Amino acid sequence: MLNDEIIEKFLEDKRLEGRASGTIQEYCFRLMELKQYLETVETPIDSLTGNTITNFVRFLRRKGQKAQTIKNKLSTLSVFEKWALKEGLVSSTVVSPDYYPKSTETKRIRRLSDTELRVFKSYLDTLQENARAAFYLMMGTGCRVGEATHLRVSDVSLRGKSVYVDIKDAKWGSDRCIPITDKKAAQIVWRYCEGVEIDTRPLFRLSKRTIQGYATTFAQKTGITFRCHLLRHTYAALLTEQGVPMPTIQYLLGHKSLGMTAHYTQSAITDLKDLTPEI
C-alpha cells in the first residue's frame, strides 16, 4: 500500500532535486489524498489500473473539484509513478494525459478596470500600513499572495533608485528577483520597509488568510468582484497594454511557460485604432 514512509522518501528525493518548498507541500497534500482514496478502495499502489485512475477522477469530481485541479493532482501522481518505477516499487506507470479531465468552459479572465483600481486604492488607504504596503507590493510586482506574505525585510532592497524584491521558495520553483514596476507602489513599500523593525517575523506581519480577508471585505463593501489573484491578472494585462514583451512578463510572474502568461494577459485592453483603416 501507499504509506507515509514511501511518501516521505519521495518528498525527500524531490527536495534533494531542488524542488521548492511550496511544490513539496503540494506534492504531500495530493499524495495524502490519493493514499486515503486507495485505502478506501483497498488498492495497493503497485496495482493501479486505468480503471483506478478513472474512478479516482470521478471521486474528485464528486467532491466538486475543478478540471484544472484534478489535472494538477494527476500530474503529481505521474511524477510519483515515474519515481516509484525507478525505485522498483511498481512495474509500470499508468497515468497519462489521456486521463486528464477536459475543461468544458473557457472563461476570459478580466482585469480590474481603471475605475475599479481607483476604488481599490482608496480602500487601501483605510487599512493599516502593513496591509496597505502588502497590497501595493502585489500590484507593483504581480507576485502571488503567498509569496508576499512569506517575504522577510532582507528580501526587499534598493538598487540605485529602484526597489527590488527577492522571491524565494516560490510555487513550482519560480524563484526570482524582480523590480517593483509601479512608482507609487515602490515608494509605499520602501517607506514601509524603512520603518519596520528587523527581526525574524515576515515583512508584513500578516498571514495569507488575513490578506484574503481584506480582499473579501473590499468585495463585500463595494460589490466589485475581487480576490487577491485578480491583482496578478491585472498586473500582467497592464504590462501588456504598455507593450512589455511577453517573455519579460513571463519572468516577472514566474511562469514556466509563455502559454500560462498568455492566459494572464488575455484581459489586456487592446487599442486597434492603428490597425483599423478609415474609409
Regions found by a protein language model. Give the residues of each.
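N-terminal core-binding DNA-recognition domain of tyrosine recombinases/integrases
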Residues: D4-R108, Y123
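DNA breakage-rejoining catalytic core of tyrosine-based enzymes
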Residues: V90-S92, S103-V119, W172-K183, I198-P202
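Catalytic-site neighborhood detector that most strongly recognizes the C-terminal catalytic loop/helix
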Residues: R111, L253-E278
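Basic, Lys/Arg- and aromatic-enriched nucleic-acid-binding interface segment
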Residues: D114-V145
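Short, charged phosphate-coordinating catalytic segments
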Residues: M138-K161, P247
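Active-site-proximal segment of tyrosine recombinases
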Residues: E147-A148, F226-R227, A236, G243-S257, ...
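Conserved tyrosine-mediated DNA breakage-rejoining catalytic core shared by Y-recombinases
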Residues: H150-I188
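Active-site/catalytic core of tyrosine-dependent DNA strand-transfer enzymes
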Residues: T181-T225
